C-alpha cells in the first residue's frame, strides 16, 4: 500500500474508478454456486477410519461468471451476463443491476462444496455437483447473435470458462475469428 500511495494519489484513483462507471461489458460463461460447509472436527470415528465432525453452518456464494459479474458491478461497471440456469435461486441472488440472460433456464447450475474445519480454517474435502452443459445446435447461433450485438456496439466481451462444456469447439472456432480482442479465463476439473 505504501508503494501505491507514493505512486498514485487519491484523486488519480478516483478518476480511474469514475472511468469504470462508464464501461459496459458482456460476460459469457459458467455459473457456479460455491458452498462452504463449516464443521468442528472431533477426531476419528471409533467404528471406521472416518473423520467425525459436528456441523456448524453452511454458506453459499455466487461463483464462476456470477462472481465476476458481481465484482465488476461493484466497481460500477454495467454488466450484461450471458450464462445458463435460473436467475433466482433460493441459495443466492444477483444484484438487480446486472442484466441476466440465460440461454438454458433448465440446465442446473454447477455447485462446488467445500467442507471446512472451523478450528484451523482448513479445507478438509471438496465435492463437485454438476452435469456437463448439453451441447445442441440451437446454442451456437444464440451465442453468435449475442456476441455480434456487443461487437457491433463496441462493448468488451469476456469469456469465463470453468470447463462445464458451455463452450463447444465450434464456438471457440467462431470466437477465434473475431477481429476484436476477446479475453478468456479457463479453469477446469474435467
Residue ranges and their predicted role:
Residues 1-49, 54-190:
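Ribokinase/PfkB-type carbohydrate-kinase core domain
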